[in-house]
């Protein structure tokens, strides 16, 4: 009779140990996945303030591009400090660029509206200086 009780207790302990180890493994897996997602978000960006090579990427206030660049709204874009669609830096170096508010190659206004040229001079389709 004592051996049956001992076997029953050992069996119950084995089941508890098995269940707790599976729960621990699941929690560890979820934690690793969360950390991996955080690292990927930091590296490659997303929709808000992320990605690219350096301060890059995204749709809203996104860095994007190679250095400080890119995005659709208030985006840096371009190669260095440039680009975007709305209020975008654009261009190759500190260029205004984009569709609204800028463009050009070097500190140029440029673009479709309020724009630009090659070196801060010249026209666009509307209000160019």
From Swiss-Prot:
Expression sites (tissue/organ): Expressed in axilary buds. Detected in growing stems, leaflets and floral organs, but not in roots.
The residues forming the signal peptide are 1-25
- Chain segments annotated as transmembrane: none
Instruction: Tell me the superkingdom of the source.
Output: Eukaryota
- Keyword Signal set for record: yes
Q: Which UniProt keywords apply?
A: Developmental protein, Signal
Pfam families documented for this protein = GRP
- Coiled coil, from the record: none
- Using the UniProt annotation, give all residue ranges assigned to the region (Disordered): 110-129
Instruction: State the family named in the UniProt similarity comment for this chain.
Output: Belongs to the DRM1/ARP family.
Put simply, this protein is called: Dormancy-associated protein 2
Which species does this protein come from? Answer: Pisum sativum
Q: What is the lineage of its organism?
A: Eukaryota, Viridiplantae, Streptophyta, Embryophyta, Tracheophyta
């Amino acid at each position: 009779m004592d051996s049956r009780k001992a076997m029953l207790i050992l069996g119950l302990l084995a089941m508890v140990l098995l269940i707790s180890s599976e729960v621990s493994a699941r929690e560890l897996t979820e934690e690793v996945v969360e950390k991996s997602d955080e690292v990927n978000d930091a590296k490659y960006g997303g929709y808000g303030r992320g990605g690219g090579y350096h301060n890059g990427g995204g749709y809203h206030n996104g860095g994007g591009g190679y250095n400080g660049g890119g995005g659709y709204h208030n985006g840096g874009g371009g190669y260095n400090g440039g680009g975007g669609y709305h209020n975008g830096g654009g261009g190759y170096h500190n260029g205004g660029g984009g569709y609204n508010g800028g463009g050009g190659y070097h500190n140029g206004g440029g673009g479709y509206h309020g724009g630009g040229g090659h070196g801060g001079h010249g026209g666009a389709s509307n209000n160019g200086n």
